[in-house]
Amino acid sequence: MNKTITPSLETIERNWFLVDAKDKTLGRLATEIATVLRGKNKPTFTPHLDTGDFVIVVNAEKIEVSGKKASQKLYRRHSGRPGGMKTEKFESLQERIPERIIEQAVKGMLPHNSLGRQQFKKLKVYKGADHPHAAQNPVLLNS
């Protein structure tokens, strides 16, 4: 009889991947990133363990969306106080904080529990082409 092998925390191997977001569609890129963060691309994937890898995203300000989403897509946040709803369009958020666009898209594709929060911490998004993770020797992710 075959036994299912559950990887232990010592045997899980974590790699670093680099993704260039220049001229990539937001949703298509976010699904690939979420897959790697969860570890679903590995044969050792286990739903209740964090088996995923680290992902570095550069050129976040050059991400693209199709159609009229650039002028019509809205991002909402709430301060928690009465009347504290703030709404911002994709264009203005891309000028101000382009990292948040990719972070929000990926976060919505991860589990909405403590495991998803743990996996989200392995995502590093940067506005320009430079990143401080050269020592980790990130491998370019084919996307």
UniProtKB/Swiss-Prot annotation:
Gene3D superfamilies: Ribosomal protein L13 (3.90.1180.10). CDD domains: Ribosomal_L13. Pfam families: Ribosomal_L13. GO terms for molecular function: mRNA binding; structural constituent of ribosome. GO terms for biological process: negative regulation of translation; translation. Keywords: Ribonucleoprotein, Ribosomal protein. It comes from the Bacteria. SUPFAM superfamilies: Ribosomal protein L13 (SSF52161). InterPro entries: Ribosomal_uL13, Ribosomal_uL13_bac-type, Ribosomal_uL13_CS, Ribosomal_uL13_sf. GO terms for cellular component: cytosolic large ribosomal subunit. NCBIfam families: rplM_bact. This protein is one of the early assembly proteins of the 50S ribosomal subunit, although it is not seen to bind rRNA by itself. It is important during the early stages of 50S assembly. Belongs to the universal ribosomal protein uL13 family. Part of the 50S ribosomal subunit. This is Large ribosomal subunit protein uL13. It comes from Prochlorococcus marinus (strain MIT 9312). The lineage of its organism: Bacteria, Bacillati, Cyanobacteriota, Cyanophyceae, Synechococcales.
